[in-house]
Amino acid sequence: MTLEERVEALEKELQEMKDIEAIKELKGKYFRCLDGKMWDELETTLSPNIVTSYSNGKLVFHSPKEVTDYLKSSMPKEEISMHMGHTPEITIDSETTATGRWYLEDRLIFTDGKYKDVGINGGAFYTDKYEKIDGQWYILETGYVRIYEEHFMRDPKIHITMNMHK
Amino acid sequence: MTLEERVEALEKELQEMKDIEAIKELKGKYFRCLDGKMWDELETTLSPNIVTSYSNGKLVFHSPKEVTDYLKSSMPKEEISMHMGHTPEITIDSETTATGRWYLEDRLIFTDGKYKDVGINGGAFYTDKYEKIDGQWYILETGYVRIYEEHFMRDPKIHITMNMHK
């Protein structure tokens, strides 16, 4: 390869590394906004063309607003949630599309209302599709397959000393 | 340095970044296949020269098949497992060898059989050696030192609503 071609190849590969990092940060922002219940900011992580399937594909949505409205209604302030993403496997499929696998651990705690003291723990394998529009990466598709999910009653004597949603 | 030398240095450094990312993805695939009980796919992450020590080095294996057979037998369908890897420290030792440290959190749930309702939680520091063969990274050595491990009886009233292994 000529020097010119080698520099061009470097530029392309460095762009891919930057895209992988940007996608990891996009997902970090998604989890942070989800558990921080920052719905408007969460919407900015979703592609206008989003197709989302939740709960093993039973629930499907077709716009950022539909997704955030669903999340907002299904994760009210009475519910503390933690979605912890691990060991991503990101593949750049083209200059504007990518695929990502994430190992998810999740934890839900109901602090009030009908489900007070209910706890839910689980794990899942996420598979996402991402799309780059005008230099910015967005979540285009997200869905997961549960490893397991368990529901239980928490000991009421557990004292929640801090809760950002109350 | 000449332009040629500068391009060469860039190529070398970018290759190291790509190798670090590839190793992180390799480990993500290993954990995903382990907990998804996808033994054939797990085998593809292991080097033909693998030397593995589990349980603080007491168990040692010398081929991918030996490792996956052991894992398959010791982690049957009655056992939900979650191995969550955190904060990797990857060092590229040479063009074809690397070392990786991982902070592991693990959770095991026995859903049936002799150990029904047993739970095991723990944490460990993993130290791995990786090997690159024909451009592909593999786990060459993996072993860990336990931070702690705890065994307990889970409340039978905990309701497992989803389990990919059942």
Curated annotation (Swiss-Prot), chains A, B:
- Mind listing the GO biological process terms from this record? bile acid biosynthetic process; bile acid catabolic process; lipid catabolic process
Superkingdom per UniProt: Bacteria
A single GO molecular-function term is: bile-acid 7alpha-dehydratase activity
Q: Which GO terms describe its cellular component?
A: cytoplasm
Known catalytic reactions: 7alpha,12alpha-dihydroxy-3-oxochol-4-en-24-oyl-CoA = 12alpha-hydroxy-3-oxochola-4,6-dien-24-oyl-CoA + H2O; 7alpha-hydroxy-3-oxochol-4-en-24-oyl-CoA = 3-oxochol-4,6-dien-24-oyl-CoA + H2O; 7alpha,12alpha-dihydroxy-3-oxochol-4-en-24-oate = 12alpha-hydroxy-3-oxochola-4,6-dien-24-oate + H2O; 7alpha-hydroxy-3-oxochol-4-en-24-oate = 3-oxochola-4,6-dien-24-oate + H2O
Q: What does this protein do?
A: Functions in the bile acid 7alpha-dehydroxylation pathway, which forms secondary bile acids via the 7alpha-dehydroxylation of primary bile acids, and is carried out by intestinal anaerobic bacteria. Catalyzes the dehydration step in this pathway, yielding a 3-oxo-Delta(4,6)-bile acid-CoA intermediate.
Q: What is this protein called?
A: Bile acid 7alpha-dehydratase
